């Protein structure tokens, strides 16, 4: 690991804790806002991680103040009250009805998706082909997993993303000096060669397999439409393996007693090609456009689609990957299911050697390449190192950098 990378607290070397020990660990966390030294932060992060109970475990103790490892910097928190909801910008809602039966409707849909991807980087879709009862059962499956008995759930707590197809954790990484998010997550690796269903918990196994199949098919359709919007043949993005890597994330955001002090998910952009998100009625998702935070409202039956960093890179900035976040809320739990299409990093030969750069058909004298070609390994390594600074996540890959 490069020396410049932040410290990562890994949990899979810690022991499981009995309930009484878990309660003691929870009490060890400091619940008063204060500036933490690195040593204090490290100690409190370790105490939190060792419980394997996540944010839900903290809430279940009956807290009225959040632990200080969750309190974000004032410069970030100030923006919550300043920008929330104060914009006339509306995220497009695109109806996919008639997509496969009417060529004229398909052309209109392609045009709308292309425009939304260029201007907003986000759009919502309705009549997308995933039945409402399947969506409802997927949300319920995420809820059941996170709300099941702690002793069962704790067995899946891990940060070993290289050797497990299913795991649960709280926060992707725990880093001294970086505020934790008010969120727990179950992660499922659902690549093109599907894992053994027996690796998934009983409480959500069947719906995980069913929903992921629906979303995989929808992803292939969206990559077709995005290819056409770029003036390419429909299977161009699929042939670039944009749909090979698939991860399903079941986020659980407990009610927060002090939502003004933390975030459900901090500001970030997605690293892969495309994300398909299902959010519940609580809402809280915001995207950053024209230096304003714009609410992405809950629409019954709709799915939120967003362009991710690699798709911006290979389209040479034609499509935009924009930063977004999720606000914490006194109401909860909020549940969302994100399916990220990204790089399938592992092949039979090891790490994929494939280079990704601007698509040749999109390059001309008038539109020269903005980005250098980059390997999968370098993209992941460099982007992770840039994860917690304020510069663009794609800036290291620009040719003029």
From Swiss-Prot:
A Pfam family this chain is assigned to: DIOX_N
The cofactor note reads: Binds 1 Fe(2+) ion per subunit.
Name its co-factor(s): Fe cation; L-ascorbate
Its UniProt entry gives the catalysed reaction(s) as: deacetoxyvindoline + 2-oxoglutarate + O2 = 4-O-deacetylvindoline + succinate + CO2
GO MF terms, alphabetically ordered? desacetoxyvindoline 4-hydroxylase activity; L-ascorbic acid binding; metal ion binding
Task: Indicate the segments forming the Fe2OG dioxygenase domain, all copies.
Answer: 242-345
Upregulation details from the record are: By light.
Residue stretches in coiled coil: none
Where along the chain is 2-oxoglutarate bound?
334
Q: Which InterPro entries match?
A: DIOX_N, IPNS-like_FE2OG_OXY, IPNS-like_sf, Oxoglu/Fe-dep_dioxygenase_dom
**GO BP of this protein:** alkaloid metabolic process; coumarin biosynthetic process; response to molecule of fungal origin
- Where does this protein chiefly localize? cytoplasm
Query: What pathway is it annotated to?
Result: Alkaloid biosynthesis; vindoline biosynthesis
Name the tissues where it is expressed.
Answer: Highest levels in leaves, lower levels in stems and fruits. Not expressed in flowers and roots.
Q: Which GO terms describe its cellular component?
A: cytoplasm; nucleus
Mind listing the UniProt keywords for this protein, alphabetically? Alkaloid metabolism, Cytoplasm, Dioxygenase, Iron, Metal-binding, Nucleus, Oxidoreductase, Vitamin C
What subcellular locations does the record give? Cytoplasm; Nucleus
* Key word Cytoplasm present: yes
Q: What class of enzyme is it?
A: oxidoreductase
- Tell me which EC number(s) this protein carries: 1.14.11.20
Q: Where does Fe cation bind?
A: 268, 270, 324
Q: Which family does it belong to?
A: Belongs to the iron/ascorbate-dependent oxidoreductase family.
Q: What job does this protein perform?
A: Catalyzes the C4-hydroxylation of desacetoxyvindoline.
Q: How does it assemble?
A: Monomer.
| Protein name per the record | Deacetoxyvindoline 4-hydroxylase
Gene coding for it = D4H
């Amino acid at each position: 690991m490069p020396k410049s990378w932040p410290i990562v607290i890994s949990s899979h070397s810690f022991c499981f804790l009995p309930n009484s020990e878990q309660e003691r660990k929870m009490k060890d966390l400091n619940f008063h806002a204060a500036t933490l030294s690195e040593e204090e932060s490290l100690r409190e992060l370790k105490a939190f991680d060792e419980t394997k109970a996540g944010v839900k475990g903290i809430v279940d103790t009956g807290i009225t103040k959040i632990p200080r490892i969750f309190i974000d910097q004032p410069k970030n928190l100030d923006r919550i009250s300043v920008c929330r909801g104060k914009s006339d910008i509306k995220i497009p809602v695109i109806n996919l009805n008639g997509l496969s039966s009417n060529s004229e409707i398909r052309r209109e849909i392609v045009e709308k998706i292309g425009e939304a991807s260029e201007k907003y980087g986000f759009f919502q879709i309705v009549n997308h082909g995933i039945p409402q009862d399947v969506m409802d059962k997927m949300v319920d499956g995420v809820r059941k997993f996170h709300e099941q008995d702690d002793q069962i759930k704790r067995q899946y707590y891990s940060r070993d993303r290289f050797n497990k197809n299913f795991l649960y954790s709280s926060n992707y990484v725990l880093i001294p000096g970086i505020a934790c998010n008010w969120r727990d997550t179950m992660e499922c690796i659902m690549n093109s060669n599907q894992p053994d269903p027996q690796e998934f918990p009983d409480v959500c196994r069947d719906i995980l397999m069913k929903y992921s199949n629906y979303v995989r098919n929808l992803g292939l359709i969206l990559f077709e439409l995005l290819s056409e919007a770029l003036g390419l043949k429909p299977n161009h993005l699929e042939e670039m393996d944009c749909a090979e890597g698939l991860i399903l994330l079941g986020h659980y955001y407990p009610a927060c007693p002090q939502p003004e002090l933390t975030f459900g998910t901090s500001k970030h952009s997605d690293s892969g090609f495309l994300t398909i998100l299902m959010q519940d009625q609580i809402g809280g998702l915001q995207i950053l456009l024209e230096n304003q935070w714009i609410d992405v409202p809950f629409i019954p039956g709709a799915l939120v689609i967003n362009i991710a960093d690699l798709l911006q890179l290979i389209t040479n900035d034609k499509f935009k990957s924009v930063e977004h976040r999720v606000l914490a809320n006194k109401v909860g739990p909020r549940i969302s299911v994100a399916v990220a299409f990204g790089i399938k990093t592992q092949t039979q030969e090891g790490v994929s050697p494939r280079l990704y750069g601007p698509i040749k058909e999109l390059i001309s004298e008038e539109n020269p390449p903005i980005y250098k070609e980059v390997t999968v390994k370098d993209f992941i390594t460099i982007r992770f190192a840039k994860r917690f600074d304020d510069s663009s996540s794609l800036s290291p890959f620009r040719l003029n950098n």
